[in-house]
């Protein structure tokens, strides 16, 4: 309908998968690199998660195309299966004949024999499960049992799980802890940034034959805001916006076209009216002198030095303090305030709804989620958002800012608490979310193909951490790889010679990068990194006996 009007060979924003419209953003590239590394490492499970429409299937298709030709793949698209159905589906994908009445053991044995035959023939075997958040715990356990099949040197089967964020929550269940421990690579795919949305739209238009910029800058800003950076929503909104512009006879897509299209697609009404725009402009004129204008655009105050304040006064355990804890818990039943406190510890004042992992790259940070023991979390040396269990089994959230041999400091709601380390161990389930500083260029993976800026940063950081002299370097050479592997071995990491998120996170600490640290406050020359908004609050002490 509108293609000829805009000089297009075909509709550029169809939601049907088409390889020629494949746009790999930096985040999609990172996800693909992590999955490839996990499969090359020979581990049991590789995990990719992301919200609906962020491009998980796009990444999985690229992964399948990049696998060696000697790889046999079982692609499971309908994971709403029983344990037997799963094994039967894998047999179907591997083209293994079986009797329709075959039970679990027979199907399992068929798959085992086939995996052994593939190994003898020099082939790799991979099972890829899409929409894996729909798998039942028993089915996930059956997959784990399949990955138990191994020789002295390698596993016979690797499994790629792709799903929505609920999959991460599922894997934190105690009954699935053995499976979670076998995940050798994981990546959470975030929505596109504003810059990526701009590039994504231009790319799809160019593929369809349009070389002129037909979306105005304001339209692209509105598109990013109303789509949330979700590629599927971007496609739907852009398609409707092209229709709207065509209907009014304009060759330019403007802010109003995007707003109308977004409302038609998702029912989201754009609150960015002229009245609110005027208020922002007036507020900006008043606040620019104090540096708050950046918050209007980015959701954060400008970066400040890491906040360090005086240790609050400790209070003895009393029934009143137990009641105070109950009140604090009631204000911390959602993770929002704990995440906001985590940003404050890093020196960023942000609105509650802006304090999310998705917004971390705006501040030059990355989110990392995982499971660990207290000792493992302490080794990471980063303050973290943690979930705790109260005496009734309910979940609440806190920010861990200090961790010593006997005590820990928490922020629960708007109050500081000191707890026994054993108390924390008893009531913490092991999951955490932390923020860490990205290297220059905003990348979370530095390897052979890294640019000169990232390579120089990595070499400088390794030199400081290993107490070696600095040098000039522009490419990822053998000396840099050796230094990186030495650092990884010293830190108990896999010495793969690739600086992924775990390596970069440890490197930030060892290289002395400016950051808040999760260290024992008794070892500090200064005082713990606690938000300055809590200066006047006394620290409440809670012992294990009091719990």
Curated annotation (Swiss-Prot):
Membrane topology summary: Peripheral membrane protein
Pfam families in the cross-refs: AAA_22, GspA_C39-like, PG_binding_1
One GO CC term, this protein: cytoplasm
Record keywords, A-Z: ATP-binding, Cell membrane, Cytoplasm, Membrane, Nucleotide-binding, Transport
Main location as per UniProt: cytoplasm
InterPro entries assigned to the protein according to its UniProt record, in alphabetical order: AAA+_ATPase, AAA_22, ExeA_AAA_ATPase_DNA-bind, GspA_C39-like, P-loop_NTPase, Peptidoglycan-bd-like, PGBD-like_sf, PGBDSf
Subcellular location: Cytoplasm; Cell membrane
Compositionally biased intervals (Polar residues): 524-533
UniProt-annotated binding residues for ATP: 50-57
GO molecular-function terms, A-Z: ATP binding; ATP hydrolysis activity
Family note: Belongs to the ExeA family.
PANTHER family the UniProt entry points to: GENERAL SECRETION PATHWAY PROTEIN A-RELATED, PHOSPHORIBULOKINASE _ URIDINE KINASE FAMILY
Protein name, per record: General secretion pathway protein A
Gene name of the encoded protein: exeA
């Amino acid at each position: 309908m509108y293609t000829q009007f805009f000089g297009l060979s075909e509709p550029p924003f169809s939601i049907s998968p088409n390889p020629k419209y494949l746009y790999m953003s930096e985040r999609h590239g990172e996800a693909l690199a992590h999955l490839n590394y996990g499969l090359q490492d020979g581990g049991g499970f590789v995990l990719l998660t992301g919200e609906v429409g962020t491009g998980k299937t796009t990444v999985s298709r690229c992964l399948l195309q990049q696998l060696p030709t000697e790889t046999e793949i079982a692609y499971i698209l309908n994971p709403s299966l029983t344990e037997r159905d799963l094994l039967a589906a894998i047999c179907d994908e591997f083209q293994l004949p079986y009797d329709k009445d075959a039970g679990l053991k027979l199907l399992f044995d068929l798959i085992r024999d086939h995996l052994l035959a593939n190994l003898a023939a020099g082939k790799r075997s991979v099972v890829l499960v899409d929409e894996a958040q729909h798998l039942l715990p028993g089915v996930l356990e059956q997959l784990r049992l399949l990955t138990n099949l191994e020789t002295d040197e390698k596993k016979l089967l690797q499994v790629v799980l792709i799903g929505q964020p609920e999959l991460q929550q599922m894997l934190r269940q105690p009954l699935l802890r053995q499976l979670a421990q076998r995940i050798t690579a994981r990546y959470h795919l975030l929505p596109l940034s504003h810059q990526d949305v701009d590039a994504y739209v231009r790319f799809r238009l160019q593929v369809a034959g349009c070389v002129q910029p037909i979306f105005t800058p304001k339209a692209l800003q509105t598109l990013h805001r109303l789509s949330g950076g979700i590629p599927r929503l971007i496609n739907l909104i852009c398609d409707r916006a092209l229709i709207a512009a065509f209907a009014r006879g304009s060759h330019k897509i403007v802010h109003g076209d995007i707003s109308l299209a977004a409302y038609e697609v998702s029912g989201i009404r754009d609150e960015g009216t002229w009245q609110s725009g005027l208020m922002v402009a007036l507020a900006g004129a008043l606040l620019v002198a104090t540096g708050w204008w950046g918050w209007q655009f980015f959701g954060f105050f400008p970066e400040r030095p890491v906040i360090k304040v005086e240790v609050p006064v400790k209070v003895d355990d009393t029934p009143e303090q137990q009641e105070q804890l109950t009140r604090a818990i009631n204000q911390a039943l959602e993770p929002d305030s704990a995440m906001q406190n985590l940003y404050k510890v890093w020196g960023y004042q942000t609105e509650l709804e802006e304090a999310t992992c998705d917004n971390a790259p705006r501040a030059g940070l990355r989110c990392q989620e995982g499971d660990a023991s207290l000792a493992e979390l302490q080794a990471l040396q980063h303050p973290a958002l943690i979930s705790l269990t109260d005496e009734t089994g309910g979940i609440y959230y806190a920010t861990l800012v200090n961790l010593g041999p006997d005590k820990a400091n928490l922020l629960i709601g708007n109050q500081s608490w000191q707890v026994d380390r054993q108390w924390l161990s008893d009531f913490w389930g092991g999951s955490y979310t932390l923020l860490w500083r990205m290297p220059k260029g905003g990348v979370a993976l530095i390897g052979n193909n890294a640019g000169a800026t990232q390579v120089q940063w990595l070499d400088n950081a390794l030199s400081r951490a290993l107490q070696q002299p600095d040098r000039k370097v522009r490419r990822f050479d053998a000396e840099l790889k050796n230094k990186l592997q030495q650092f990884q071995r010293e830190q108990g990491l896999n010495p793969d010679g690739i600086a992924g998120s775990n390596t970069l996170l440890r490197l930030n600490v060892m290289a002395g990068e400016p950051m808040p640290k999760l260290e024992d406050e008794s070892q500090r020359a200064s005082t713990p990194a606690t938000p300055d908004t809590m200066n006047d609050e006394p620290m409440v002490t809670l012992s294990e006996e009091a719990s």
